[in-house]
């Protein structure tokens, strides 16, 4: 990671994310400090990415790379530069509704697997796009395919509470409000995609149940 990205993350993005969210973090000790590793979090706002980058220690943030939709984050040269150079995204193509990766002939997870092979810590949002509020949506199986390809890589579930109120879906201006981040114990690949996804969903919902009440509600 270049010094520019490191300085912007530590000196700009981290203070901004902490100011906007308060970042009450539980279970920080479960965060992976080296890769290959996967962090799987719920997704209610674009603030989620900055918040997750903010809670990693400086010695590990160099390897943290969020998986993001190429068509959204690379649609504009300025946004694309910031997304790649500062946030450090791993851009992947999104399949159209009802389209399967196998049918399209495109290996959409190839960039993510390459990042894991390089020793990165991937941040993935299995719901895909930000949902509405703090309810967990349907999880896509891409994270299971990554875990299957790298069975020794830990998969750490994370529940983010309240980010959807800091920057609701469709809004452009954030509002400083308190959020909670709950980091669960890492999961290991057990050889079955369906079982893995069920375990991940159960882990995320268990973390959600432990989240404190929203202080501004």
Regions found by a protein language model. Name each.
Residues 81, 121, 129-194:
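A cross-family acyltransferase "interaction/gating" segment
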Residues 18-26, 104-106, 163-165:
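Short gly/ser/thr-rich secondary-structure transition/capping motifs
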Residues 1-22, 75-87, 167, 171-176:
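Alpha-helical membrane-targeting segments
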Residues 14-20, 98-103, 133-134:
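Short, flexible loop segments at the rims of nucleotide/cofactor-binding pockets, characterized by
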Residues 42, 69, 127, 160-162:
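Cofactor-binding loop segments of dinucleotide-utilizing enzymes, especially the Rossmann-like FAD-
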Residues 48, 104-136, 180-216:
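N-terminal/domain-start segments enriched in small and hydrophobic, helix-friendly residues
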Residues 33-98:
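Catalytic core of membrane glycerolipid acyltransferases/transacylases, capturing the structured
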Residues 13-43:
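Helix-to-loop junction immediately C-terminal to a conserved catalytic motif
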């Amino acid at each position: 990671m270049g010094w520019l990205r490191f300085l912007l993350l530590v000196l700009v993005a981290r203070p901004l994310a902490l100011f906007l969210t308060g970042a009450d973090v539980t279970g920080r000790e479960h965060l992976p400090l080296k890769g290959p590793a996967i962090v799987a979090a719920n997704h209610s706002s674009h603030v989620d990415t900055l918040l997750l980058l903010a809670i990693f220690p400086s010695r590990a943030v160099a390897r943290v790379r969020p998986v993001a939709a190429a068509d959204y984050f690379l649609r504009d040269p300025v946004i694309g530069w910031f997304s790649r150079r500062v946030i450090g995204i791993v851009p992947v193509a999104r399949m159209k509704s009802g389209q399967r990766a196998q049918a399209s002939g495109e290996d959409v997870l190839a960039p993510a697997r390459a990042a894991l092979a390089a020793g990165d810590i991937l941040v993935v949002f299995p719901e895909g796009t930000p949902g509405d509020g703090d309810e967990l949506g349907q999880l896509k199986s891409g994270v299971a395919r990554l875990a299957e390809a790298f069975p020794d890589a830990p998969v750490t579930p994370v529940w983010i509470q309240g980010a959807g109120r800091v920057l609701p879906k469709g809004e452009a201006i954030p509002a400083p409000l308190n959020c909670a981040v709950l980091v669960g114990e890492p999961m290991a690949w057990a050889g079955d995609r369906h079982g893995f996804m069920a375990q991940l969903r159960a882990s995320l919902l268990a973390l959600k149940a432990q989240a404190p009440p929203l202080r501004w509600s």
